[in-house]
A protein has these predicted regions:
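Extended, low-polarity segments enriched in aliphatic/aromatic residues
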Residues: 22-79, 86-292
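N-terminal amphipathic/basic-hydrophobic helices that include classical n-h-c signal peptides
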Residues: 1-24
Length: 292
């Protein structure tokens, strides 16, 4: 395959741009801590190609636990605003091919207001896990550790799933408008990390205790426990798949839905409080995956 690359220098430490033209298909990569979009053709063709391009396989070999975090929601009528199992399958297949032989892969979610294991079954994840011999984890009932942070905005402490703290977490949301947040993205997807066992109300099956304040604060504080390490957004209905570091991926996702990222309250809050600090300190997750 012939590749043509055009490099446009800007700031040698942080920013550069690469335009890669592959068979007339343009993929843009912007910056060392940015993201990638690729034209969608099919899950089976686009996902492996994208993940090979950004060299994700090299990164996941470093980790003993890989956690795929889809977004699952209750089924209303015949539809569910959930991550497609077919989309997750292609990410899973890539991880299985590229992981360290002793590494484990899990699919984890904590559905709000429904039994997670039943949702796994209804949406095809149980069969997927059986087919590839990987574990399903209900984050609503998994082992947690008490996390206290001085820079939580609203929560005094959060009971956070240990599997997410210990694993390399790949957030896998569908791109869609949300009811309580502007849209479902790789960062707001992590609301599923609040275990219902600790956050549901006495007379409710939903995680009502995270709704004492506007949801942007719950998103912010759960991300203070841990950012997802990587994000792949199913924006196939918009004609592309997005992948990269969560902050940038969600900014690009916002544009696809017609928003400026600083119009999205949770993104604006996150940007202003801690992600800039992480970038300056070089601590944002896998800053060199896209650059390699």
């Amino acid at each position: 395959m012939r590749l043509t690359e055009e490099r446009i220098p800007n700031n040698s430490k942080i920013l550069y741009s690469i335009i890669i033209i592959i068979k007339k298909e343009i993929i843009s990569i912007k910056g060392m801590v940015k993201g990638v979009s690729i034209k969608f053709r099919s899950y089976s063709e686009t996902i492996p190609r994208l993940l090979e391009l950004i060299n994700l396989g090299k990164e996941i070999k470093k980790h003993s636990k890989i956690v795929l975090k889809p977004y699952l929601s209750p089924i209303e009528g015949e539809k569910s605003l959930s991550t497609s199992a077919a989309f997750v399958e292609q990410v899973l297949r890539f991880c299985l091919r590229n992981k360290n032989p002793v590494s484990e892969i899990f699919i984890a979610e904590g559905v709000d207001g429904e039994d997670t294991m039943e949702m796994f079954s209804k949406l095809g994840y149980t069969k997927l896990a059986e087919r590839y011999s990987v574990g399903l984890i209900d984050l609503n009932n998994t082992e947690v550790e008490r996390t206290e942070k001085y820079d939580f905005i609203k929560f005094h402490e959060i009971m956070y799933p240990k599997i997410l703290k210990e694993g390399f977490v790949i957030s896998l949301p569908p791109l869609a408008l949300g009811e309580e947040v502007a849209f479902i993205g790789s960062l707001s997807n992590m609301l599923g990390a609040f275990p219902a066992r600790h956050y549901k109300g006495f007379f409710s099956s939903t995680k009502s205790k995270i709704r004492k304040w506007p949801m942007k604060y719950a998103v912010h504080d759960i991300l203070k426990c841990k950012l997802p390490d990587f994000a792949i957004v199913d924006s196939s209905e918009k004609g592309v798949i997005l992948a990269g570091l969560p902050r940038e991926v969600d900014k690009q996702a916002a544009k696809l839905l017609g928003f400026e990222w600083n119009q999205v309250d949770y993104l604006k809050l996150i940007e202003s409080t801690f992600l800039e600090k992480k970038i300056k300190e070089g601590k944002e997750a896998i800053p060199n995956v896209i650059a390699q």
